[in-house]
């Protein structure tokens, strides 16, 4: 999280095109996750951001979601990466909220995605025009 704070403050001066945050959600939840998601998304104005997270509050801010799974084939471990379609994003966020994707968790995930979309739209609207 310290690196996130530094990158947020120095984002205009940092020429690094891609920033990678691996499990930045460790030890946080709820509102803190929301703030981390907001800060990560703000970095996308000047960088490509890749983030591994298990926190729905952070995942909801992603513009694109990928699901990463390890599978074993003939005693070899393979990593499978799939880009998720919009309906799959809802199901995945519902899943990381608490296991099985129930009707309630699906509605909560839809609301979380909608709220993050509105936040991003509002934030972008208040940026100075170039």
Stretches with model-predicted labels:
Residues 31-130:
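C-terminal lobe/lid and adjacent interdomain/linker elements of RecA-like ASCE P-loop ATPase modules
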Residues 7-9, 26, 73:
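Short, glycine-/Ser/Thr-/acidic-enriched flexible segments
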Residues 22-23:
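Walker B catalytic acidic pair
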Residues 1-5, 26-30, 83-84:
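Conserved ABC ATPase signature
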Residues 12-14, 26-34:
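Conserved D-loop-proximal element of ABC-family nucleotide-binding domains
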């Amino acid at each position: 999280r310290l690196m996130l704070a530094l990158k947020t403050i120095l984002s205009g001066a940092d020429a690094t095109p891609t920033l990678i945050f691996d499990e930045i959600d460790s030890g946080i939840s709820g509102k803190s996750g929301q703030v981390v998601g907001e800060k990560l998304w703000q970095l996308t104005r000047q960088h490509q951001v890749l983030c591994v997270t298990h926190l729905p509050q952070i995942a909801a801010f992603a513009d694109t979601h990928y699901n990463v799974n390890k599978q074993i084939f003939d005693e070899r471990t393979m990593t499978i990466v799939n880009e998720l379609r919009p309906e799959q994003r809802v199901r995945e966020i519902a899943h990381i909220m608490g296991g099985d994707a129930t009707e309630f968790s699906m509605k909560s995930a839809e609301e979380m995605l909608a709220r993050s979309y509105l936040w991003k739209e509002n934030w972008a609207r208040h940026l100075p025009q170039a």
